Design a protein with these regions (language model features):
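N-terminal Sec signal peptide cleavage junction
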Residues: 31-32
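Early extracytoplasmic/lumenal segment of secretory-pathway proteins
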Residues: 51-138
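Extracytoplasmic ligand-binding site segments that recognize negatively charged/polar headgroups
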Residues: 81, 85-88, 111, 124-257
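Periplasmic-binding protein-like
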Residues: 159, 172, 231-234, 241-242, ...
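Mature extracytoplasmic/periplasmic domains
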Residues: 295-357
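N-terminal secretory signal peptides
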Residues: 1-12
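Conserved C-terminal helix/tail region of periplasmic/extracytoplasmic solute-binding proteins
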Residues: 359-377
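A ligand-binding cleft/hinge motif common to bilobed small-molecule-binding domains
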Residues: 135-139, 259-278
Length: 377
């Protein structure tokens, strides 16, 4: 059951949670971690800029509120490839909302947790696998370690962002951030394959999971030979490697680079701390440089509490959770009733290529190709 009025967590606490997420004083992420492409626990205390103006004054989100969902009751073992700094507050909110709900979270990289579940076999305690990209979800499903999600969960999200075995809970778009003192948007190529001939200074983060997923998409669309030629081309042109994509975006804003390849939210985080920074977002069109990837969740096939696992995943698609992803992590919500934060195109307005994002699970061949070209991964 939920807490009653005397317990102090009612509709008013839901409003406080949403206000805390949407207000200009909300925590701002200013850094990122390594290989899975997940931002890290580095809050910014700088003034709120472009994104802050988008966060302030947002109306109540649409979608299904948690009050209309089944209560969460019982013990849930969550294996999370998402950083605790990003999702810990949301999980704590659900924990506080339901007094009979006890979540236990094991954090780690998504790929490591896939291997852990596989190694644990039928004795795995994991109920839910929650991770930062579709590749990890696809890998677990391909190993036969997931179970079919409820029809309600599947119908909540557009079919391109889920299968019957896993569902996306938030999304991110690949972009080309550029320095506005050096280039105008019209001068940035809209074809990702044109960048080996780009005259400006480029940057990327090839050890980063999102960058490797982008390169995997190029292998799928263009073939291995063309991808090898592209990789060799940008390396020969002097592309500068960075440890993560926030550093790429920051270097562009600082004038150290002219353009680069990152997820959309890194530009927004730079602008959130420095609203006048000379950085803007450009998009390529319908190619590997324009893929849209998702964080998402699956119920493990041997889940000790599969019904609770299904209900928990449904809560990740609630109005409150989707608003949280929009205003706290600057991701794209995946239910149509909640809009992204800031001056961003909607998911429907993005010119993304049509393909099965679960194919991004085959990253090993991409890493081998990048290393063969001489790129450190």
């Amino acid at each position: 059951m939920r807490r009653n009025v005397d317990d102090g967590l009612t509709h008013s606490s839901r409003r406080r949670f949403l206000a805390g997420a949407a207000g200009a004083g909300a925590i701002v992420i200013a850094g990122c971690t390594g290989n899975d492409g997940e931002p890290a626990d580095s809050p910014s205390d700088s003034a709120v800029g472009q994104i802050g103006s988008g966060r302030a004054g947002r109306s109540a989100p649409g979608g299904t509120p948690i009050d209309d969902l089944p209560d969460l009751e019982g013990e849930l073992e969550l294996y999370s490839g998402r950083n605790e700094f990003l999702v810990g507050e949301l999980i704590s909110f659900l924990d506080d909302t339901y007094p009979d709900f006890t979540p236990s979270v094991r954090y780690g990289s998504g790929s490591d947790l896939v291997n852990t579940i596989d190694t644990e076999g039928s004795g795995s305690p994991a109920d839910v696998f929650y991770t930062v990209n579709a590749g990890n979800l696809g890998a677990l499903a391909d190993a036969g370690r997931t179970q079919t999600l409820s029809t309600e969960i599947q119908e909540t999200v557009s079919e391109e962002f889920r299968t019957d075995q896993w569902v996306g809970t938030s999304g991110r778009a690949r972009t080309v951030p550029f320095n506005t003192n050096a280039y105008s948007e019209s001068e940035i190529p809209t074809d990702i394959m044109a960048f080996p001939d780009f005259e400006g200074d480029l940057g990327w983060a090839p050890t980063y999971g999102s960058c490797q997923a982008f390169s995997t998409a190029m292998r799928i669309f263009e073939g291995e030979d063309a991808t090898r030629e592209w990789l060799e081309g940008v390396v020969d042109a002097g592309i500068t490697p960075y440890a993560d994509e926030f550093q790429v975006a920051q270097a562009i804003a600082n004038g150290e680079l002219d353009a680069g390849f990152t997820n959309h939210y890194y530009i927004q985080r730079v602008l959130d701390g420095s609203p006048s920074a000379p950085i803007e977002t450009a998009f390529t069109s319908g190619d590997a440089g324009a893929i849209f990837n998702v964080a998402g969740a699956a119920v493990v096939d041997t889940a000790p509490n599969p019904e609770l696992a299904q209900h928990f995943i449904r809560h990740l698609l609630s109005a409150e959770a989707q608003e949280y992803f929009a205003v706290e992590t600057f991701e794209y919500p995946l239910i149509p009733e909640v809009e992204p934060v800031g001056d961003l195109p909607t998911v429907d307005e993005l010119d993304v290529p049509e393909f099965d994002i679960a194919e991004l699970s085959n990253v090993r061949a991409t890493i081998d190709l990048m290393r063969d070209v001489g790129i450190s991964t």
